[in-house]
């Protein structure tokens, strides 16, 4: 049994979906989205450039390798999945994951694309708590997942404090899901093995 923490490979210059300035912090939005399946605002795509004097945003995408990615980086640090990636994951779901999708629009000039945010509505018990490492305040430092507890899930969030597990970039997927993603020729995703006991 293999599972992986999935994430986007590193890009030096990337397009980032920026939420409007007035939307607040990401963790404050999670509760407000509990009953929603559509984001109440649109994201705007900007080119992110890292220079010696800091990070810069612009509308000049000439140095960006690929503008539209299957997992679009964004100012909320949430997973924004393309429709292609969403469909792959959807067909692999067991129905026990407690997952729904929130659609969002990302605008770039005259083009708008719909992306999807995986929103976990049930906190899944996936850890072998005896094998995990915790900080003095109870925060999870190194998770150890229970093979018995995760065997019925194709995707699940890395547990975290408060409600941050509901919408998180720390998403684990089964080897079957990974193989389907690779088979579909999606190459910009990084896979990190997780500890299963």
Task: Kindly give the residue locations of the regions a language model identified.
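Acidic, proline/glycine-rich low-complexity IDRs
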Residues: 9, 110-197
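A glycine-rich, hydrophobic loop/mini-helix early in the fold
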Residues: 44-74
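Internal, well-folded beta-alpha domain core
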Residues: 75-76, 86, 97-106, 152-155, ...
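Short, well-structured beta-strand/strand-turn elements
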Residues: 93-105, 187-195
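Short coil/turn motifs at helix boundaries and re-entrant loops, enriched in small/polar
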Residues: 79-86, 169-175
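Short, extreme N-terminal leader segments that mark the start of a protein/domain
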Residues: 1-31
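Extended, non-catalytic structural segments that build the interaction scaffolds
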Residues: 67-80, 162-169
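Short active-site loop/helix that positions an aromatic residue
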Residues: 84-94, 180-184
């Amino acid at each position: 049994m293999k599972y992986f923490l999935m994430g986007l490979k590193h890009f030096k210059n990337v397009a980032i979906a920026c939420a409007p300035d007035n939307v607040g912090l990401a963790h404050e939005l999670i509760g407000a989205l509990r009953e929603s399946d559509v984001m109440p605002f649109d994201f705007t795509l900007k080119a992110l450039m890292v220079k010696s004097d800091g990070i810069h945003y612009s509308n000049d995408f000439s140095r960006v390798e690929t503008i539209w990615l299957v997992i679009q980086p964004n100012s909320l640090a949430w997973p924004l999945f393309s429709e292609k990636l969403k469909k792959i994951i959807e067909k692999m779901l067991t129905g026990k994951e407690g997952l729904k999708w929130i659609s969002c629009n990302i605008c770039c000039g005259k083009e708008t694309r719909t992306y999807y945010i995986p929103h976990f509505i049930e906190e899944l018990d996936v850890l072998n708590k005896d094998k995990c490492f915790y900080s003095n305040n109870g925060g999870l430092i190194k998770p150890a997942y229970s093979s018995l507890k995760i065997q019925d899930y194709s995707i699940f969030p890395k547990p975290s404090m408060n409600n941050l597990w509901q919408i998180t970039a720390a998403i684990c997927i089964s080897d079957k899901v990974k193989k389907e993603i690779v088979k579909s020729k999606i190459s910009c995703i990084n896979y990190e093995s997780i500890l299963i006991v």
